[in-house]
Amino acid sequence: MTRLYIQDVTLRDGMHAIRHRLAPAQLRTIAAALDAAGVDAIEVSHGDGLAGSSLTYGPGSNTDWEWITAAADVVTNAKLTTLLLPGIGTIAELEHAHTLGVRSVRVATHATEADIAVQHISRARELGMDVSGFLMMSHMAAPAELARQAKLMEQAGAHCVYVTDSGGRLTMSDVRDRVRAYRDVLDEATQIGIHAHENLSLSVANSVVAVEEGVTRVDASLAGQGAGAGNCPIEAFIAVATLQGWEHGCDLFALQDSADDLVRPLQDRPVQVDRETLTLGYAGVYSSFLRHAERAAIEYGLDTRRILLEVGKRELVGGQEDMIVDVALDLLSSHA
């Protein structure tokens, strides 16, 4: 089979788990360790992508440029990657990231809004970058519709399109159906990627099913560091991939050491499946809403799970973090 492309997201999605607060020196150490461990690509930015630092998403301790520069100083083998959400990050910011050494970008939209990524994907291709389309909250679109959106990204120039389970809501059959739908409509040369979350404890299983269906790009992170219950833990996935006989370039023990020695100590809240993060997956809620919902629950004396269930019922998506307070106030008034 084709060699797997292991995309580490510790230094992007993992930012959600530490409220986007990471010193450049710490980032540099982790990036160097990942590079030495043989991952194919290292994604770096605020958790919500370039220019994500804001009151809505959460301010970062540093700028994207400081973080990217720190990584570029030490990454010599892996492809330095970043994330861009059109409407948050701009083409100008993409171009600046490129001047700092970023050579790959994932352009992310909601599952049904691929059309807003066309200009950004096209410009990234003009810059000579490796480009992936990133269809977030993939559980909110049926397989055929998601595949139609993936085709739009491919037509814009994406080398790869991801099934992106931002809510950690997909089951193995859900992943299988979406990957097959992609394969039915995408050109053979277009790669497919999987981005899993651990909210239902299925991130490794979903990633394995995806690879069995022909996916070659797999997102994962050290100790699963990421939003909600985290991403697919890279050390666990690589162990399984090795047992399966799948080709990759990663050093399992080096990844284990980096996860336990460098990443877990950073966590001010455990990245794990617990009552709150499980509810994210159960309700199909955007994983990065976790910290926002927990903060609102404390402020208004509510159970975080009640907030998350209502958020899921209303089908809120990324960018509507400010609505979480409205949800909390509505819950308070309904039980006054």
UniProtKB/Swiss-Prot annotation:
Reactions performed catalytically: (S)-4-hydroxy-2-oxopentanoate = acetaldehyde + pyruvate
What's an example Gene Ontology biological process for this entry? catabolic process
InterPro entries, from UniProt?
2-IPM_HCS-like (IPR050073), 4OH_2_O-val_aldolase (IPR017629), Aldolase_TIM (IPR013785), DmpG_comm (IPR012425), DRE_TIM_HOA (IPR035685), PYR_CT (IPR000891)
Q: What is its EC number?
A: 4.1.3.39
Site residues, Transition state stabilizer:
12
Does the keyword Lyase feature in the UniProt annotation? yes
| Annotated GO MF terms | 2-isopropylmalate synthase activity; 4-hydroxy-2-oxovalerate aldolase activity; manganese ion binding
Name the domain of life this protein comes from: Bacteria
Q: Which keywords accompany this UniProt record?
A: Aromatic hydrocarbons catabolism, Lyase, Manganese, Metal-binding, Plasmid
Residues given in the record as Mn(2+) binding sites: 13, 195, 197
Which PROSITE patterns does the entry link to? Answer: PYR_CT (PS50991)
Specify the Pyruvate carboxyltransferase domain's residue ranges.
4-256
> What is the protein name given in its UniProt record?
4-hydroxy-2-oxovalerate aldolase 7
